[in-house]
Amino acid sequence: MKQGLQLRLSQQLAMTPQLQQAIRLLQLSTLELQQELQQALENNPLLEQTDLHDEIDTQQPQDNDPLDTADALEQKEMPEELPLDASWDEIYTAGTPSGPSGDYIDDELPVYQGETTQSLQDYLMWQVELTPFSDTDRAIATSIVDAVDDTGYLTVSLDEIRESMGDVEVDLDEVEAVLKRIQRFDPVGVAAKDLRDCLLIQLSQFDKSTPWLEEARLIICDHLDLLANHDFRTLMRVTRLKEEVLKEAVNLIQSLDPRPGQSIQTGEPEYVIPDVLVRKHNGRWTVELNSDSIPRLQINQHYAAMCNSARNDADSQFIRSNLQDAKWLIKSLESRNDTLLRVSRCIVEQQQAFFEQGEEYMKPMVLADIAQAVEMHESTISRVTTQKYLHSPRGIFELKYFFSSHVNTEGGGEASSTAIRALVKKLIAAENPAKPLSDSKLTSLLSEQGIMVARRTVAKYRESLSIPPSNQRKQLV
């Protein structure tokens, strides 16, 4: 064995704390960023929040022309020590992105959220407490409510409920009587044993003089399977109902709720604050950051001036350290805003047809297209478009919504999957309800428009729109 010295040159990327902070801020959603900045304000005395009225607007050029890419790139850049295109896997695990939401709203930007977090069981127990039950019946009612799932159906038999009462002796008739009272709670039909039971309970709440009530009850009691399969021809034959009567009875049944429990929202509220505002001004689409969504930070000059006059080294070091942290945070925030604005402007420039005419005119676009246009890495584009929302006259969308794969067209062009999905939705909306379009027919109609896709692809797009197959869409006209 021989020993020796060898000289080797190598380069490595050093992930400094400042770089980690810059990339992490880039990934955070607006709400997460607000929490991050609020914590920084509480922990760092060298940071303070500025008055929005005194803050200089740095979101867009004075000529209000956001689609000028050259102007968009003329922003204050970060020092070379903050290469935001560094590998995200080394630092942070991305959260789950959200989808597009909502319809058009006015210039005011409210926070969007779910209506309630009350569970179905809580809502039913509230009604139990308001009902004059005996102690025994209240115990039975509690057991019944505990056995109701999120869709509103009873998950156990009445015998199991009776046995769950323990030392309390109750008859099956008592359990049945309490169950019938609960089934008339709001929402009506809750705690039903099955779909047939649920629909019949809801029908029982109608006035006896309601037109087509008996016909609807007949269909539910004896021919629910035919109705589920949309086999109207057989249904007319076995019920001996005329087509007009059958249509009215089916309409009455369709007005009922097959999952009454889902009308009570149980999920946590979802908050959406738009990061970017898109408006049309003087015939051009303008893009700006939502100035109300992010706190404006600045250095506290009073404390900063104490840096050189501190009484001891410990105080001086404390002030210097916090001052440096504050400067890096402000610069990282500026970099985040600049990157978000540049990417958003580029997206709007590429997708102007969508904002003008809708989903059918969405252009195929991938991360690499925007990355090349703004001269950034694809990983940076992915971070800055995740959990960032754009508010436009067409609604609120996550920035990632504007990226979609492409499908070749007959003329040698390309169509985005989003546009094709919109066309499928449009074709189905215009179909004859008595003869709905099959996936094969939809494929043929798309082919006539020069869009060559497989039938299974059309089926996938239809399912992503939560549209049932043609045999389930068939209706009486």
Curated annotation (Swiss-Prot):
PROSITE patterns xref list: SIGMA54_1, SIGMA54_2, SIGMA54_3
Keywords: Arginine metabolism, DNA-binding, DNA-directed RNA polymerase, Nucleotidyltransferase, Sigma factor, Transcription, Transcription regulation, Transferase
DNA-binding region extent: 366-385
Motif RPON box, residue numbers: 454-462
Superkingdom as given in the UniProt entry: Bacteria
GO terms of molecular function: DNA-binding transcription activator activity; nucleotidyltransferase activity; sigma factor activity; transcription cis-regulatory region binding
GO biological process, one term: DNA-templated transcription initiation
Keyword Chloroplast: no
InterPro entries reported in the protein's UniProt record: RNA_pol_sigma_54, RNA_pol_sigma_54_core-bd, RNA_pol_sigma_54_DNA-bd, RpoN_core-bd_sf
UniProt keyword ATP-binding present: no
GO cellular component: DNA-directed RNA polymerase complex; protein-DNA complex
Function: Sigma factors are initiation factors that promote the attachment of RNA polymerase to specific initiation sites and are then released. This sigma factor is responsible for the expression of enzymes involved in arginine catabolism. The open complex (sigma-54 and core RNA polymerase) serves as the receptor for the receipt of the melting signal from the remotely bound activator protein GlnG(NtrC).
Family indicated by similarity: Belongs to the sigma-54 factor family.
Name of the featured protein: RNA polymerase sigma-54 factor
Organism name: Salmonella typhimurium (strain LT2 / SGSC1412 / ATCC 700720)
Phylogenetic lineage: Bacteria, Pseudomonadati, Pseudomonadota, Gammaproteobacteria, Enterobacterales
